[in-house]
């Protein structure tokens, strides 16, 4: 997951929205940690559940990473301004966990990653990731680099 | 009585998350602790939107300040300072408290102290058990934080020894309660079910406890996944999920790691006191196991009463009073809310006013010699 996040970092640029879905414990935050490393942003990427959203500024001249957990948000986010973030979203890479049905209105273009893990009490640590690019931004992008 | 009257009288404002807290203390004596549950249980269940929390703080702010002053039986004019949480927390929510604190401080002609939320969680114990021993080892566990901190002086030196690398302890409780359909917040309800369950029924993993793992860091994500999977397997097999045993075994895994690492940190650093703060400190099993292990290791345990462990204004006032007592520099009028204020900064001193400057306050409110409030 972490390595996938690092590879994902190479594909992303300011203004991109990534939506992560998957069961509790699928590895959404772990993937985001790799993404943060790949983007070279400040701070440890930990679960944003409690604070809803956390901004990780770039350590270089790249875009900041905005890590959102939409689980506790009651309704849809008509405007991300509701999150009270002090960064411009068009200048940032945004990753949203649990955002289905809540943040689609933000942009037509988004990259969707669905992480599936084995269900039940098993030692099976394999994760299956389904990547779907939506909108013009991703129509021509080559996501095959994610396969490594 | 004469002695206590000499101690600093400070009002503290806390708005880092979704409780509007205002406390008044004199030195290490609690005079008032007013909390407005700005977002009621129903709304919390549906979820929290930061912007909504900020608005709720705004509405609750002035009434809660008035209530705290009334409860304390003091006049705003008698205050020696106004303290406020400057961070970390939700940016918009913090801003409401900081703005209110500035307005009151300026109008009253009192020094302003922007302080750290985490250091406040430690300092609040002075209201319960008297002056903090120096050094103090602190285990802070809440919905947003899980940290081991060592402080030799709560106003100037707080050192992080370890923290969670993924989920906070309280968050793990909330998420497991979610999987078990027990509602939000998860801590109290899991605590309740766990009392009737067997903590050894299921061997859930203890994160980061291997010999090569970081000695003082925590990880609760793997535990969360293991518990979720165990429950899924039961459900898939059509069996009933033993909620009491799952709660007890999960809770045991969390508090086992927390207390084990905290006691180890005390031993390694040669500290004979451990304080536990933050919302999870209200957990009965954490208190019991910490007591047991501290006694065995010859460490004195200090845990404030539950109401002082969760977010409140009294803890901010307690740290503010300590800042005044130790002559720490007041904050400038351009103090800003810092959502990611590092734990190593117990307060935000004004520029050009070094720590311990004996006349720090006077410079800061030169602009407001007139008391606009009276």
UniProtKB/Swiss-Prot annotation, chain A:
<protein>
    <recommendedName>
        <fullName>tRNA threonylcarbamoyladenosine biosynthesis protein TsaE</fullName>
    </recommendedName>
</protein>
<keyword id="KW-0460">Magnesium</keyword>
<feature type="binding site">
    <location>
        <begin position="25"/>
        <end position="30"/>
    </location>
    <ligand>
        <name>ATP</name>
    </ligand>
</feature>
<dbReference type="GO" id="GO:0005737">
    <property type="term" value="C:cytoplasm"/>
</dbReference>
<keyword id="KW-0067">ATP-binding</keyword>
<keyword id="KW-0819">tRNA processing</keyword>
<dbReference type="GO" id="GO:0002949">
    <property type="term" value="P:tRNA threonylcarbamoyladenosine modification"/>
</dbReference>
<keyword id="KW-0963">Cytoplasm</keyword>
<dbReference type="InterPro" id="IPR027417">
    <property type="entry name" value="P-loop_NTPase"/>
</dbReference>
<dbReference type="GO" id="GO:0005524">
    <property type="term" value="F:ATP binding"/>
</dbReference>
<feature type="binding site">
    <location>
        <position position="97"/>
    </location>
    <ligand>
        <name>Mg(2+)</name>
    </ligand>
</feature>
<comment type="similarity">
    <text>Belongs to the TsaE family.</text>
</comment>
<keyword id="KW-0479">Metal-binding</keyword>
<keyword id="KW-0547">Nucleotide-binding</keyword>
<dbReference type="InterPro" id="IPR003442">
    <property type="entry name" value="T6A_TsaE"/>
</dbReference>
<comment type="function">
    <text>Required for the formation of a threonylcarbamoyl group on adenosine at position 37 (t(6)A37) in tRNAs that read codons beginning with adenine. Is involved in the transfer of the threonylcarbamoyl moiety of threonylcarbamoyl-AMP (TC-AMP) to the N6 group of A37, together with TsaD and TsaB. TsaE seems to play an indirect role in the t(6)A biosynthesis pathway, possibly in regulating the core enzymatic function of TsaD.</text>
</comment>
<feature type="binding site">
    <location>
        <position position="29"/>
    </location>
    <ligand>
        <name>Mg(2+)</name>
    </ligand>
</feature>
<feature type="binding site">
    <location>
        <position position="125"/>
    </location>
    <ligand>
        <name>ATP</name>
    </ligand>
</feature>
<dbReference type="Pfam" id="PF02367">
    <property type="entry name" value="TsaE"/>
</dbReference>
<dbReference type="GO" id="GO:0046872">
    <property type="term" value="F:metal ion binding"/>
</dbReference>
UniProtKB/Swiss-Prot annotation, chain B:
<feature type="binding site">
    <location>
        <position position="174"/>
    </location>
    <ligand>
        <name>substrate</name>
    </ligand>
</feature>
<comment type="function">
    <text>Required for the formation of a threonylcarbamoyl group on adenosine at position 37 (t(6)A37) in tRNAs that read codons beginning with adenine. Is involved in the transfer of the threonylcarbamoyl moiety of threonylcarbamoyl-AMP (TC-AMP) to the N6 group of A37, together with TsaE and TsaB. TsaD likely plays a direct catalytic role in this reaction.</text>
</comment>
<feature type="binding site">
    <location>
        <position position="191"/>
    </location>
    <ligand>
        <name>substrate</name>
    </ligand>
</feature>
<dbReference type="InterPro" id="IPR022450">
    <property type="entry name" value="TsaD"/>
</dbReference>
<dbReference type="GO" id="GO:0005737">
    <property type="term" value="C:cytoplasm"/>
</dbReference>
<dbReference type="InterPro" id="IPR000905">
    <property type="entry name" value="Gcp-like_dom"/>
</dbReference>
<feature type="region of interest" description="Disordered">
    <location>
        <begin position="337"/>
        <end position="374"/>
    </location>
</feature>
<dbReference type="GO" id="GO:0002949">
    <property type="term" value="P:tRNA threonylcarbamoyladenosine modification"/>
</dbReference>
<feature type="binding site">
    <location>
        <position position="187"/>
    </location>
    <ligand>
        <name>substrate</name>
    </ligand>
</feature>
<feature type="binding site">
    <location>
        <position position="121"/>
    </location>
    <ligand>
        <name>Fe cation</name>
    </ligand>
</feature>
<dbReference type="GO" id="GO:0061711">
    <property type="term" value="F:N(6)-L-threonylcarbamoyladenine synthase activity"/>
</dbReference>
<feature type="compositionally biased region" description="Basic and acidic residues">
    <location>
        <begin position="359"/>
        <end position="374"/>
    </location>
</feature>
<feature type="binding site">
    <location>
        <begin position="140"/>
        <end position="144"/>
    </location>
    <ligand>
        <name>substrate</name>
    </ligand>
</feature>
<keyword id="KW-0012">Acyltransferase</keyword>
<dbReference type="GO" id="GO:0005506">
    <property type="term" value="F:iron ion binding"/>
</dbReference>
<feature type="binding site">
    <location>
        <position position="311"/>
    </location>
    <ligand>
        <name>Fe cation</name>
    </ligand>
</feature>
<feature type="compositionally biased region" description="Low complexity">
    <location>
        <begin position="337"/>
        <end position="352"/>
    </location>
</feature>
<comment type="similarity">
    <text>Belongs to the KAE1 / TsaD family.</text>
</comment>
<keyword id="KW-0808">Transferase</keyword>
<dbReference type="InterPro" id="IPR043129">
    <property type="entry name" value="ATPase_NBD"/>
</dbReference>
<keyword id="KW-0963">Cytoplasm</keyword>
<dbReference type="Pfam" id="PF00814">
    <property type="entry name" value="TsaD"/>
</dbReference>
């Amino acid at each position: 997951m972490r390595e996938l996040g690092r590879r994902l970092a190479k594909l992303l640029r300011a203004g991109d929205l990534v939506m992560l879905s998957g069961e509790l414990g699928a590895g959404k935050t772990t993937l985001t940690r790799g993404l943060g490393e790949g983007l070279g942003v400040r701070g440890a990427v930990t679960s944003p559940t409690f604070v809803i959203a956390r901004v990780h500024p770039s350590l270089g001249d790249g875009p900041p990473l905005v890590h959102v957990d939409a689980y506790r948000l009651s309704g849809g986010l008509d405007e991300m301004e509701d999150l009270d973030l002090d960064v411009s979203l068009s200048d940032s890479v945004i990753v949203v966990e649990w955002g289905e049905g809540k943040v689609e209105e933000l942009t037509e273009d988004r990259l969707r990653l669905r992480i599936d893990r084995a269900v039940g009490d098993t030692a099976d640590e394999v994760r299956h990731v389904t990547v779907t690019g939506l909108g013009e931004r991703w129509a021509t992008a080559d996501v095959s680099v994610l396969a490594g | 009585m004469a002695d206590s009257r000499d101690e600093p009288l400070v009002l503290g404002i806390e708005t880092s998350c979704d409780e509007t807290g205002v406390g008044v203390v004199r030195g290490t004596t609690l005079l008032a602790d007013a909390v407005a549950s700005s977002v009621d249980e129903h709304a919390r269940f549906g979820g929290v939107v930061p912007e909504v929390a900020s608005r709720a703080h705004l509405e609750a702010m002035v009434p809660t300040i008035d209530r705290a002053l009334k409860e304390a039986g003091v006049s705003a004019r008698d205050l020696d300072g106004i303290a406020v949480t400057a961070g970390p927390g939700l940016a918009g929510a913090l801003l409401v408290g900081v703005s209110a604190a500035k307005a009151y401080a300026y109008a009253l002609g009192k020094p302003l102290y922007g302080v750290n939320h985490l250091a406040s969680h430690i300092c609040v114990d002075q209201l319960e058990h008297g002056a903090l021993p120096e050094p103090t080892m602190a285990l802070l566990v809440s919905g947003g934080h899980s940290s081991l901190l060592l402080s030799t002086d709560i106003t100037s030196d707080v050192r992080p020894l370890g923290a969670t690398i993924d989920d906070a302890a309280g968050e793990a409780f909330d998420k497991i309660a979610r999987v078990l359909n027990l509602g939000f917040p998860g801590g109290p309800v899991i605590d309740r079910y766990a009392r009737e369950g067997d903590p050894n029924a299921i061997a859930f993993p203890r994160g980061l406890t291997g010999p090569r793992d970081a000695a003082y860091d925590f990880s609760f994500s793997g535990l969360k996944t293991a518990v979720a999977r165990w429950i899924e397997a039961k459900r898939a097999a059509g069996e009933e999920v033993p909620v009491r045993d799952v709660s007890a075994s999960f809770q045991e895994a969390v508090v086992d790691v927390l207390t084990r690492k905290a006691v180890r940190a005390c031993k390694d650093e040669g500290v004979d006191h451990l304080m536990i703060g933050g919302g999870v400190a209200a957990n009965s099993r954490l208190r019991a196991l910490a007591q047991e292990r501290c006694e065995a290791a010859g460490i004195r345990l200090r845990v404030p009463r539950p109401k002082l462990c969760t977010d409140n204004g009294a803890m901010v006032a307690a740290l503010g009073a300590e800042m005044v007592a130790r002559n720490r520099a007041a904050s400038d009028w351009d103090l800003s809310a810092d959502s990611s204020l590092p734990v190593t900064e117990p307060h935000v001193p004004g520029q050009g006013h070094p720590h311990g400057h004996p006349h720090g306050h006077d410079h800061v409110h030169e602009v407001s010699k007139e008391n606009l409030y009276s």
